[in-house]
Amino acid sequence: LTATISFLDKIRASSEKAILFAERKETQKMLQRVVKNRYGYTPKIINGDTPTSSDPNAGKQSRQSAIDDFQNRHGFGVIIMSPVAAGMGLNVTAANHVIHYSRHWNPAKENQATDRAYRIGQDKDVYVYYPMAVSPDFKSFDVTLDELLSRKINLASSTIFPTERIEVKPEDFEQIFNI
């Protein structure tokens, strides 16, 4: 939490905006209280409880209205999101800082969440932060999870490659199918 507050202090000093990703609703509420107490305003939270824009009962509480409020806010701002609920279909280009307060076990979901800031209309460099608890005496859970996610990413990138790079020749078919 100390590192996250330090990041937010620097972001505030630059009058920029941040997306703060956290998995658990309790953690999201705690982060909301921290931002309110430290910076004097209550950031919106987007998670599975936040109605989508297509929900006729959503009104001013929809995900898109929360993002619109955040996008239109002048100066420093924070929006708190679940990486799963906000992972697809939302554009948050007013933010150029992304903080993954808690990590998702699936690096693809984490990348999709980060991509909320990397959209058409983003005109600033985007910075991504992964605050971790570290210790000189033992390997923390955060470090272990970061290593696991790195291995998953490396495995995926070494086994999956774009199909346009595949060149199949007729002799390959002959060899494979003994034709």
Where in the sequence are the language-model features?
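Conserved helicase/translocase motor-coupling segment
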Residues: 1-34
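Hydrophobic, well-ordered secondary-structure elements that form the walls
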Residues: 4, 20, 80, 98, ...
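Conserved catalytic network of the ASCE P-loop NTPase/AAA+ motor domain
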Residues: 10-13, 69-74, 90-92
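Conserved helicase ATPase core of P-loop NTP-dependent helicases/translocases
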Residues: 19-21, 29-32, 39-86
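Short beta->alpha connector loops at strand-helix junctions that form conserved
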Residues: 47-49, 101-104
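A short beta-strand element within the Helicase C-terminal
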Residues: 90-103, 126-131
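A conserved SF2-helicase RecA2
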Residues: 105-179
